[in-house]
Amino acid sequence: MDHIHLLLSAHGFTRTRLAKSKPIVVHAIAGSGKSTVIRKILSDLPTPKAYTLGKPDPYSLSNPTIKAFAQFKRGTLDILDEYGQLPLTDLDSSFEFIFTDPYQAPTDNLFEPHYTLETTYRFGPNTCNLLNQAFQSNITSLVTKDNISFGSPYLVDPVGTILAFQPDTYLILCLHQASFFKVSDVIGYQWPTVTLYLACKISEIPEEERHLLFIGLTRHTESLLILGPDAFDSSP
């Protein structure tokens, strides 16, 4: 158990003032390396088993992996990633460490954290500026460059992987026979270039849907194109 706390500190996680309790709660921003830390725990220690409500690791014969939550069986030291996708009342008491990005989860699903990290390796400063303005966050990046652009869905063609946010955008993309993912289905995924379709301005998205907006805004590593009805007024 002490080794896990040392690993969290070594990877830049900040210990809060919250007294240790079960489970140990770790909140980390998208692209901060929390999955990397979990895999390091699995490789260093024989006991822990890790599960996720996001994207599981591919099967491996040689390395321990983060498994899908559907495969969960109680063990000696259980770890859960993306716990924020689960109502707190459904969280099994056997989990010793639980991780999530708090901005990607409904606020009712969150505990107070013992550790936090708001530095990302995924996207760059332009995305951080947009997120910090929209979510009153304090996210920083170790990536030096990225690109964000806005456009009209009627004038600009999508590029890269297409993500859709809100039912109105699902309908439009289906009518055009475009291949896309719903934002709610891409937790744990990333692509170099992403186009995000919005049905309204970022500032008009209701509070109960803002965690989904955050997911949509953080799937890219290089470039994000935001297409909405108010092409140049979609920023916060």
UniProtKB/Swiss-Prot annotation:
Record-level GO BP terms: symbiont-mediated suppression of host innate immune response; transport of virus in host, cell to cell
Signal peptide residue numbers: none
Superkingdom field: Viruses
(+)RNA virus helicase ATP-binding domain boundaries: 1-117
This protein's record includes keyword Protein transport: no
Residue ranges occupied by any (+)RNA virus helicase C-terminal domain in the UniProt entry: 118-236
Transport among keywords: yes
GO molecular function, one term: RNA binding
A Gene Ontology cellular-component term: host cell cytoplasm
Subcellular location as annotated: Host cytoplasm
Alphabetical UniProt keywords: Host cytoplasm, Host-virus interaction, Inhibition of host innate immune response by virus, RNA-binding, Suppressor of RNA silencing, Transport, Viral immunoevasion, Viral movement protein
Broad class of where this protein is predominantly found: host cell
Misc remark: TGBp1, TGBp2 and TGBp3 seem to act together for cell-to-cell propagation. TGBp1 is the main movement protein that physically cross the plasmodesma with the viral genome. TGBp2 and TGBp3 would facilitate TGBp1 function.
Function summary: Transports viral genome to neighboring plant cells directly through plasmosdesmata, without any budding. The movement protein allows efficient cell to cell propagation, by bypassing the host cell wall barrier. Increases plasmodesma size exclusion limit. Acts as a suppressor of RNA-mediated gene silencing, also known as post-transcriptional gene silencing (PTGS), a mechanism of plant viral defense that limits the accumulation of viral RNAs.
Family: Belongs to the Tymovirales TGBp1 protein family.
The protein's name in its UniProt record: Movement and silencing protein TGBp1
Species of origin: White clover mosaic virus (strain M) (WCMV)
